[in-house]
Amino acid sequence: MSDASAETAIRPTRAENFSEWYLEVIKAADLAESSSVRGCMVIKPWGYALWEHVQRVLDGMFKATGHVNAYFPLFIPLSLLEKEAAHVEGFAKECAVVTHHRLEARDGKLVPVGELEEPLIVRPTSETIIGESFARWVQSYRDLPLLINQWANVVRWEMRTRMFLRTAEFLWQEGHTAHATEPEAIDETMQMLGIYARFAEEWMALPVVQGEKTESERFPGAVRTYCIEAMMQDRKALQAGTSHFLGQNFAKASGIQFQDEKGTLTHAWTTSWGLSTRMIGAMIMTHGDDDGMVCPPRLAPQQVVIIPVIQKPEVREQVLAWCTALKRELEAQTYAGAPVRVHLDARDLQGAKKSWEWIKKGTPVRLEVGPRDIEKGAVFMGRRDRKPREKQSVPRAELVAGVGALLQEIQDALLERARTMRAAHTRVIDTKDEFYAYFTPPPTRRPNDPTPIHGGFALAHFAGDPAVEARIKEDLGVTVRCIPLEPGEPGTCAFTGQPSPKRVVWAKSY
């Protein structure tokens, strides 16, 4: 992180107050804002454009693996949710409930009337309502596998909200599949986890750990839950996506049955998997700096911005014509399988002001063009992965020919930077005392100062006792983020001395 004494566009800096820095970046980058509805946010065009690119890429990945999109009701009858006991217990405290079906004007006010015979739950997730449809759609083994994805919004009441990370309403995709056999369903679960990991690393430049959740962190009603976990710059973990093997639990609750090849009636094996707009929060906290957002080129709404520098009215037409031609040339190039996204900022503002706006938005490449640059047949280029004042003159032809390689170079640099940061703050720990010391924050200078950044990922042996896990969470606010899928050496639990099959990832988290 940068020296807090240096002049930056965002204050406080990450080192001074990471939580406040995060909110200031969202504001400065014009990503989102709070709404009048408690716990909900307005996603502004720049933030929504990021989500649209996430959707576009993931949708292609899903369809390439045989999945199709559908849409299911926002409202779930209470009786459906009650069919899966563990599921309803896990979500009960977060559910928004609709109890009336209309409003009536009384004494100048609107009053809810017409109580529903059965309350409706605003979907917190859709396993039960989709399961009802699957029960109608699946009759024979020939109907399987059933591979469905839904792009939707969900509502989960949150007491402590933070934009993009935890909001009462958020956008996501949720995949739901049904299979004839247990191995097929497990393969699907792991395939989708792999797709999430590939998307995170290749498109978001976000290094992740793939692993399984412990019993206490498992999705309500699932047999096994898998996840991808990433480290943010404050060294906390963020769960970036989950994939659940549901066994036959939801199939039995919803009545998803089919006749197999022998004519025997049996329950299907199901999965579900999801990823949400919290990925934008992950992007901010992984790549952002003290000057604002840093967008990975592959997902940036605009990959290149051209900023005309016009100090005299008489050169305006010449500079804009040159910039317009450059824009067309750059858009004719391709990067990551699509035309390069280029924006010409022709607003009547000072060049420096425009440049700083695009720095704060995180646009990967900035090109400043004035009369002198035109005379030289060049542009003045700045990269968002470097300091704002690190700019260089680049010949126009060289820039156009190499823009795809330049964007990939920035993408690779962001991924490598994130990997280096994670490696620097991942520690192998063998004793309880060392573990507690690692996650105990250093003292603050003043009583109301924010907690200093500390800790990271701890790789420690754990025998799996839920009571031990709960005690550590209570003491330190630390949880098992996942049991890594990679093979590990057996050892001794750092907390109980009992045998442990492998090390697990511990961290404080969002």
From Swiss-Prot:
Keywords in alphabetical order: Aminoacyl-tRNA synthetase, ATP-binding, Cytoplasm, Ligase, Nucleotide-binding, Protein biosynthesis
InterPro entries, per the entry: aa-tRNA-synt_IIb, aa-tRNA-synth_II, aa-tRNA-synth_II/BPL/LPL, Anticodon-bd, Anticodon-bd_dom_sf, Pro-tRNA-ligase_IIa_arc-type, Pro-tRNA_ligase_II_C, Pro-tRNA_synth_II
Protein origin, superkingdom: Bacteria
Location of this chain's protein in the cell: Cytoplasm
Chief place where the protein resides: cytoplasm
Catalysis: reaction(s): tRNA(Pro) + L-proline + ATP = L-prolyl-tRNA(Pro) + AMP + diphosphate
SUPFAM superfamilies xrefs: C-terminal domain of ProRS, Class II aaRS ABD-related, Class II aaRS and biotin synthetases
GO CC entries: aminoacyl-tRNA synthetase multienzyme complex; cytoplasm
EC number: 6.1.1.15
Keyword Lipid biosynthesis listed: no
Keyword Ligase annotated: yes
Pfam families xrefs: HGTP_anticodon, ProRS-C_1, tRNA-synt_2b
Record-level GO BP terms: prolyl-tRNA aminoacylation
A GO molecular function held by the record: proline-tRNA ligase activity
Family (UniProt): Belongs to the class-II aminoacyl-tRNA synthetase family. ProS type 3 subfamily.
Functional summary from the UniProt entry: Catalyzes the attachment of proline to tRNA(Pro) in a two-step reaction: proline is first activated by ATP to form Pro-AMP and then transferred to the acceptor end of tRNA(Pro).
Assembly behavior: Homodimer.
Domain topic, free-text comment: Consists of three domains: the N-terminal catalytic domain, the anticodon-binding domain and the C-terminal extension.
Protein name: Proline--tRNA ligase 2
Organism per entry: Anaeromyxobacter dehalogenans (strain 2CP-C)
Classification lineage: Bacteria, Pseudomonadati, Myxococcota, Myxococcia, Myxococcales
